[in-house]
Swiss-Prot record:
Xref: InterPro entries: OligosaccharylTrfase_OST3/OST6 (IPR021149), Thioredoxin-like_sf (IPR036249)
Residues that carry a glycan: N71
Organism name: Rattus norvegicus
Membrane-crossing residue ranges in chain numbering: 185-205, 210-230, 271-291, 301-321
Residue ranges, Cytoplasmic side: 206-209, 292-300
Extracellular domain ranges by topology: 30-184, 231-270, 322-335
Cysteine disulfide partners in this protein: C87-C90
Protein name according to UniProt: Dolichyl-diphosphooligosaccharide--protein glycosyltransferase subunit MAGT1
Family the entry assigns: Belongs to the OST3/OST6 family.
Length: 335
């Protein structure tokens, strides 16, 4: 009876000893992780105090942004700011990113939960290759744990690159709210006041003859300009603040038409406005050719010119529509 009891005590003692021995490396590894994490945070805080947006290359990016352990988020802007890249959008996005990072750095809510960094293609091309990136600028949130998800990549073409829009996206991904307070812009009110003053002056000078206020051609032209501006997407640009165009940093190819139906470039708005104006001018010429009292030769020329403008610009407009809505089956003259 004593032998089994003695054997049981030996087994229990061995199990406890093994458990204690196994805990020693685990605790040591945990302390090592904590030490590495503290060193990372101290380094990032030191760089942030020097410059709100930390410039990174591959040697800094891999250990501080990609490698664990991390208890902080890093908002990284991948860009191409060198002059020979000729990326105008990159410079504009960088200005907004710097504004946002400065507001965060000098706000009372500043903590070490989130850091701002940038990787320039000419300084960290290996990072671009590692992430399979072929466009700039691009904003990505690297969360404290795990890999970035699809929503952690900022939709630049949809939201634009204003500091306020990026701040809303950061709040959605990290629960960190950054207030961007800009000084008031008085250019708009001043221009409106100047326009009203000019109109008031003209009305005062022509107060004896107010027939120009009832000029149908003038009002029709003003209404047409307003309609063309609104149908081309000017209001969407005003709300979203999209880039003027997009230049691929690798190939140098500039895209003026966005490939998605969910976004557009400012240049695309100007192109659509021009095409709508061409179609409108063609319709006006056709109407004038039908109702004018001019000789038949001039009316025939106006009719041919009107048909040519409508056909040409409508075909171009339809080709743009097809390039944005890839399943659209119809085309006219141009595919």
């Amino acid at each position: 009876m004593a032998s089994p009891r003695w054997l049981w005590c030996v087994c229990a003692t061995a199990a406890v000893t093994l458990l204690l021995v196994s805990k020693v490396p685990s605790a040591s590894a945990q302390r090592k992780k904590e030490k590495v994490l503290v060193e990372k945070v101290i380094q990032l805080m030191e760089w942030t105090n020097q410059r709100p947006v930390i410039r990174m290359n591959g040697d800094k990016f891999r250990p501080l942004v990609k490698a664990p352990p991390r208890n902080y988020s890093v908002i990284v802007m991948f860009t191409a700011l060198q002059l020979h890249r000729q990326c105008v959008v990159c410079k504009q996005a960088d200005e907004e990113f710097q504004i946002l990072a400065n507001f965060w750095r000098y706000s009372s809510a500043f903590t070490n939960r989130i850091f701002f960094a940038m990787v320039d293609f000419d300084e960290g091309s290996d990072v671009f290759q590692m992430l399979n990136m072929n466009s700039a600028p691009t904003f990505i949130n690297f969360p404290p744990k795990g890999k970035p998800k699809r929503a952690d990549t900022y939709e630049l073409q949809v939201r634009g690159f204003s500091a306020e829009q990026i701040a809303r996206w950061i709040a959605d991904r990290t629960d960190v709210n950054i207030r961007v307070i800009r000084p008031p812009n008085y250019a708009g009110p001043l221009m409106l006041g100047l326009l009203l003053a000019v109109i008031g002056g003209l009305v005062y000078l022509r107060r004896s003859n107010m027939e120009f206020l009832f000029n149908k051609t003038g009002w029709a032209f003003a209404a047409l300009c307003f309609v063309l501006a609104m149908t081309s997407g000017q209001m969407w640009n005003h709300i979203r603040g999209p880039p003027y165009a997009h230049k691929n940093p690798h190939t140098g190819h500039v895209n003026y038409i966005h490939g998605s139906s969910q976004a557009q470039f400012v240049a695309e708005t100007h192109i659509v406005l021009l095409f709508n104006g061409g179609v409108t001018l063609g319709m006006v010429l056709l109407c004038e050719a039908a109702a004018s009292d001019m000789d038949i030769g001039k009316r025939r020329m106006m009719c041919i010119a009107g048909i040519g403008l409508v056909v040409l610009f409508f075909s171009w407009m339809l080709s743009i529509f097809r390039s944005k809505y890839h399943g659209y089956p119809y085309s006219f003259l141009m595919s």
